[in-house]
């Protein structure tokens, strides 16, 4: 007798512990649904359901254990009923049952479900008994097929989502080419000094380009193109004067206007 009582006490302690864990999980899940619904994600909800499912399976294992006595064979008899408020019952029930009186005892110590629930359970049991083994096997196979198709669709969506994220994160430029382009534009690194075909050859030092710019003074004041024409006019005038001073030759009747070179923009 004492051995059975000890087993019953150990079983009740284990059941109380498991039920307490399930209650805490439910309280936490309900708190999330009520206060954090805007930040909840499906993985978090599924984790909560998985935790509850595992705890319920553990509770079923405790109930189906060989060492667990059949609780349905145990009879619970209230030893004391009082209409007054009981603080100890308040503490044990966490404030849900303040009074253990004749009015609440039938509800809290009832071992049978409500009449409506009991009637519905009988109907479901009768329908299950009418189904043959072959029909039940077909229903199970159909359900398994539907679950497999659903899992395949979920896996396909997950793979497509992963591929889409990889395409979005794929690099579409070459960092080496970008750095080389920036260095060429900013510092002229890697640029060639050769002139394009169809233009003049390399210019001598001090010679102006086609645009009238000196090579050593890029970006500075532009040199007037009239400088070269003035020098040519001076040269032609000198030739004419020398020819006129030589004996035996007729003086040239061409008049040349000699302009001063003081207009040179780079006069020292």
Swiss-Prot record:
Gene: med8-a
Main location as per UniProt: nucleus
InterPro entries documented for this protein: Mediatior_Med8_fun/met
Keywords attached to this entry: Activator, Coiled coil, Nucleus, Transcription, Transcription regulation, Ubl conjugation pathway
Record-given protein name: Mediator of RNA polymerase II transcription subunit 8-A
Gene Ontology CC entries for this record: core mediator complex; mediator complex
Keyword Transcription: yes
Organism listed in the record: Xenopus laevis (African clawed frog)
Described purpose of this protein according to its UniProt entry: Component of the Mediator complex, a coactivator involved in the regulated transcription of nearly all RNA polymerase II-dependent genes. Mediator functions as a bridge to convey information from gene-specific regulatory proteins to the basal RNA polymerase II transcription machinery. Mediator is recruited to promoters by direct interactions with regulatory proteins and serves as a scaffold for the assembly of a functional preinitiation complex with RNA polymerase II and the general transcription factors.
Coiled-coil ranges (or none): 1-26, 117-160
A single GO BP: regulation of transcription by RNA polymerase II
Pfam families: Med8
Entry keyword Hydrolase: no
Recorded metabolic or biological pathway in which this protein acts: Protein modification; protein ubiquitination
Location of the region described as Disordered in the Swiss-Prot/TrEMBL record: 190-268
GO MF annotations in UniProt: RNA polymerase II cis-regulatory region sequence-specific DNA binding; transcription coregulator activity
Compartments it resides in: Nucleus
Polar residues: compositionally biased ranges: 223-246
Summary of subunit composition and partner proteins: Component of the Mediator complex. May be part of a multisubunit E3 ubiquitin-protein ligase complex.
Family note: Belongs to the Mediator complex subunit 8 family.
């Amino acid at each position: 007798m004492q051995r059975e009582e000890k087993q019953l006490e150990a079983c009740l302690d284990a059941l109380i512990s498991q039920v307490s864990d399930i209650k805490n999980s439910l309280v936490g899940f309900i708190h999330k649904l009520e206060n954090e619904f805007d930040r909840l994600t499906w993985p978090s909800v599924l984790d909560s359901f998985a935790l509850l499912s595992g705890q319920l399976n553990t509770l079923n294992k405790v109930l189906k254990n060989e060492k667990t006595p059949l609780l349905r064979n145990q009879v619970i008899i209230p030893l004391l009923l009082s209409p007054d408020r009981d603080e100890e019952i308040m503490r044990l029930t966490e404030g849900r049952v303040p009074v253990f009186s004749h009015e609440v005892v039938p509800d809290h110590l009832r071992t049978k479900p409500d009449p409506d629930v009991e009637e519905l359970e009988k109907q479901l049991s009768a329908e299950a008994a009418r189904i043959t083994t072959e029909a039940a096997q077909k229903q199970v196979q159909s359900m398994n097929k539907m679950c497999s198709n659903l899992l395949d669709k979920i896996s396909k969506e997950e793979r497509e989502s992963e591929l889409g994220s990889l395409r979005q994160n794929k690099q579409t430029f070459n960092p080496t080419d970008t750095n080389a382009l920036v260095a060429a534009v900013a510092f002229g690194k890697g640029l060639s000094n050769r002139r394009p075909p169809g233009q003049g050859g390399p210019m001598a030092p001090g010679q102006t380009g086609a645009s009238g710019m000196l090579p050593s003074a890029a970006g500075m004041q532009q040199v007037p193109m009239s400088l070269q024409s003035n020098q040519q006019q001076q040269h032609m005038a000198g030739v004419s004067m020398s020819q006129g001073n030589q004996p035996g030759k007729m003086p040239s009747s061409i008049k040349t206007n000699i302009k001063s070179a003081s207009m040179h923009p780079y006069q020292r």
